[in-house]
Amino acid sequence: MKKIGILFGMENTFPPAFVEKINSMKVEGVEAEFVKIGGIRMDESKKYDVIIDRISQDIQFYRAYLKNAALHGTIVVNNPFWWTADDKFFNYSLAHKLGVAIPPTVILPHNKHPEGTTDRSMRNLMFPLNWQELFDYVGFPAFLKPYSGGGWKHVYKVHTPEEFFHHYNQTGDLCMTLQRGVEFDEYYRCYVVGQEKVHIMKYDPKAPHHERYVKGNPPPSSAALRDRMEKDALTLCRALGYDLNTVEFAVERSVPYAIDFLNPAPDAEITSVGQENFDWIVNAAAEMAVKMALSGESPVKEMRWAGFLAGNNPPNAEKPTRKAKKVK
């Protein structure tokens, strides 16, 4: 029996719907359940063929468990080794090299010394910093935000150097980036599943959290824009090796700038994404997990971004599948 598990935290709707969907498909030899674990031996035998990870970014014990599970043959979505190493600034740099539109972005030294360090730890750091050069490169308005992490925490829109320093001086020992603000006239969040399927959702980041997914999900303003977002979303997720992710695009003058694409446990609660988007992600994720369980593929894939930089394009990036197949 092939067993699929889901590891989750505070979510209430996606995990049970995911399990129910897989079991209702009645695929011979495949079943799904909530992951149940205790203390883990280093030689723990494989209990799950596939695990969908929704929580290990917040709980170190789970992340360590998933790495060990992968070592013993479990396919983990998303790859716990790369997820541990990844950060948004690297992603911006990689995306830029891959030809995806990215606003000018810089990474900044910590405003305060990280715990356990002093000024002697910073002797390689230029002082004073070349602030004007950085401001000239990025431009204003700009967004000051952590180099990693999510949930719109510690994100500040700044219009002048004075506003920048006001907020930067409150960031403590967080490592921050400064990125040119995109004056967007359209904004989209895209689910990407299995590095194959893309679901574009009209999104309003300025609205209250429960109203950000625009009702009725109006389509992009042009077919060319839709195709560009699908292609770029697949390019990013294939390069980074993420099988479940969201990619956000802020569209300025018909150019989709990739703003946020490090979301390996993307929001999938029905209360925020709405029924139509919820149904899509449940179906697509369930089909992906079943396909993986039956595939017998290697649990840990090599990172492919290095090959892309060498000129090897993501396969079939120009032909994304837009909709998950309907499961009867």
Regions found by a protein language model. Give the residues of each.
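Active-site nucleotide/adenylate-binding loops and adjacent lid/helix of ATP-dependent enzymes
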Residues: 2-8, 70-73, 81-188, 214-231, ...
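Structured loop/turn residues at beta-strand edges in well-structured enzyme cores
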Residues: 46, 100, 138, 242, ...
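Generic enzyme active-site microenvironment
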Residues: 51, 77, 143, 246, ...
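A long amphipathic alpha-helix within ATP-dependent nucleotide-binding catalytic cores
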Residues: 209-256, 283-297, 301, 305-326
